[in-house]
Amino acid sequence: MKIVVTGGTGTLGKHVVPLLRAAGADVTVLSRHGDIACDLLGEVPAIEADVVVHLAGGQKGDDVATRNLLAACRGVRHLVHISVIGADTVPLAWLRTKLACEDAVEASGIPFTILRAAQFHDLTLSMVRGLAKLPVVPVPGMRLQPVDARDVALRLAELALGQPAGRVADLAGPAVYEMRQLVRDYLTTSGKHRLTVPVRLPGKAGKAYRGGQNLALDGDRGTHTWEEFLASR
């Protein structure tokens, strides 16, 4: 099976690619520094493969990159796309872009599988680490269900080696945390001492987060915990 993986050198891709190769797939990485050097925001060479696993993402232009990728696909029988829980329920610009990517995949005519995942442990750590740089740490009143990139990678590899399944069950971490607990865990682990102050997230997005629209209480759950992740840093 010939598989092309976009973003195969990133946080998620570095776990997905070895899993696919271990399963016997012929894997080509398409990224700025991959087997095929390519910026999906520019001209994309023709992609001939059985399966495309689309993991590449950035701060801007994900919808454009996804449309460029889809236009370059030739004879692809299955496209696996990673998205984010809350893409259709949390009114933030970057999540609207993720939903636009999903819409483009669904309208492409290519058989597809879309997996929405929760925020990765890596991103959660970056967020709380950034907050902890302040002398007084603002703690948003929200809950998160962070998932380990390895758990998401395992699920994506299974999906890529299987048949197109459309939208599959969301995947989140094994536990739900209040943001204050995530911050407290990081401060304790890193030996930092900070005053924390609760803050209310404003607007419709804040309401969505307070309502748990970023969670997957009825979805699938990974096995690696936030505590294990922190201990390994």
Spans of model-derived segments:
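N-terminal Rossmann NAD(P)H-binding glycine-rich loop of SDR-like oxidoreductase domains
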Residues: 2-25
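Short-chain dehydrogenase/reductase
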Residues: 6, 63, 91-102, 142-150, ...
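SDR active-site strand-loop-helix element
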Residues: 6, 30, 55-56, 79-84, ...
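Mid/C-terminal beta-alpha module of Rossmann-like enzyme folds, strongest
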Residues: 10-11, 150-233
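NAD(P)H-binding glycine-rich loop region in Rossmannoid oxidoreductase-like domains
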Residues: 29-74, 84-93
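A short helix->loop->beta-strand "cap" motif at the edges of active sites that frequently abuts
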Residues: 74-78, 110
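Conserved beta-loop-beta element that borders a ligand/cofactor-binding pocket
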Residues: 83, 88, 102-123, 172
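A conserved pocket-lining segment of Rossmann-fold NAD(P)-dependent short-chain dehydrogenase/reductase
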Residues: 126-147, 151, 163
